[in-house]
Structure formats: structure tokens, C-alpha cells
Amino acid sequence: MSSESKICDPLLRVLERERMVKTQIVSRGIRDKNVLTAMLSIPRECFVPSSYSSKAYEDRPLPIGFEQTISQPFMVAWMSTLLEIQKGDRVFEIGTGSGYQSAVLLSLGARIHSVEFFEPLHKTAIQNLERWKPGITKRHRFVFGSGPEFLKSGLFFEKMISCASLSELPDRESPYFRSLVPGGIFLFPIGKEEQVLMIAKRTLDDWSFRSLGGVKFVPLLGL
């Protein structure tokens, strides 16, 4: 399911990446220089199945197996911007997928803890990330399992992102709330047939939610 090349060469397909950033991302209002630099530097073709390599920079999500997808480039850039990543932020990612969103967050300086529900995708993501930056998965944590279950481990995060849609808003008793530090941000889609992207910001004993508009993601599994 991953690219057949043994290494990810950032010097290949540079013009395609530049066109993607200009026409799909900047044109839609993304101005964060760090996010734009990340999107320009990461070879997206190394994070899609080899059969879709020629379509890697198209303005749409692509299948990666198990009815999962790699998100549209703009969606990755938008969500990365909304997280307001600061260097050293501990970020919990639900749904490693192909590893592309992880790569963008890593480029922004995040310390990643990422969970993938499908073991073959987990293994492929590690291969993809290692081709991109050898040794990177040894310096961060990528595990196979359930996101909510992993949060019961007692770790705390400045930022959390779900790449799959929750069925309901998490309350203050949820592992999401308990694992997010005060002042932290949780970004997630919610809904079944109709979905919206939500941003939650935690205070000391509560959190606020804001809807950011309609989106379409695969449902969260492993609950």
C-alpha cells in the first residue's frame, strides 16, 4: 500500500508541491509560514499507495486501504494551522493513517504520540515516515490500537487531533478532557452522515466548543 521507492526524495516533484500549495492552500486563506513550509517540503507521494502516486497532489482525499483515506492537502494544512503548534508541544493524534498528517506536525516541531486502529496501516505509516526521515519513528511514539484506550495511560498533551469522526461531543469525564492540559486544544470532526469540524479549548475545569464548518471524515473506530 505504500510507495515502492525506498527513500523519499524531497527534490522530486517540487513544482507539483509548489502548485498544490499555491492553488489549493494559499488560495483558500492559509498563511501560516511554518505550515506552508512543511507542505512544500514533504513529498506527499511517499504517503500514498504507489498506485495513486500520480494523483498525490490532486485536490482530494485518496484511499489508503481499509476504507480509510489520506486527507485532502488543504484539510491537512487547515487542521495543522488550527492546532497552533508550538515547538515541543506534545500532540496526540488519533488515526495515523498513512503518516502524512504526522509528518506535517513533526515538521512543525511537535512531539507525536499517534495511534492507528488498523495494524497494516500502522506498519505502513512507520515505513512511510522512515523513508521520509530515517529514525523519526524511534524519537516519537507510533502505536497500533484504540485512541480512547491509549488515553487511559495517564499521559497529558498540549494538543490533540482526531483524523476520524467522533459520534458525540466528549464531556469532562471523557479521556480526551482528562488528557488535555488546561489551555490545550482538541481538534476533531463530529457526526455521522453530516459532520462538522470542532475545536475544543480546555480551561481548568471545563472546555469550550466552536464549530468550524462542514467536513467529511471516516468514523472513529475502536470505541
Where are these regions (language model features)?
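Class I SAM-dependent transferase core
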Residues: S2-F92, Y100-V104, L108, L121-T124, ...
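Conserved nucleotide-cofactor-binding alpha/beta core module
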Residues: E84-S208
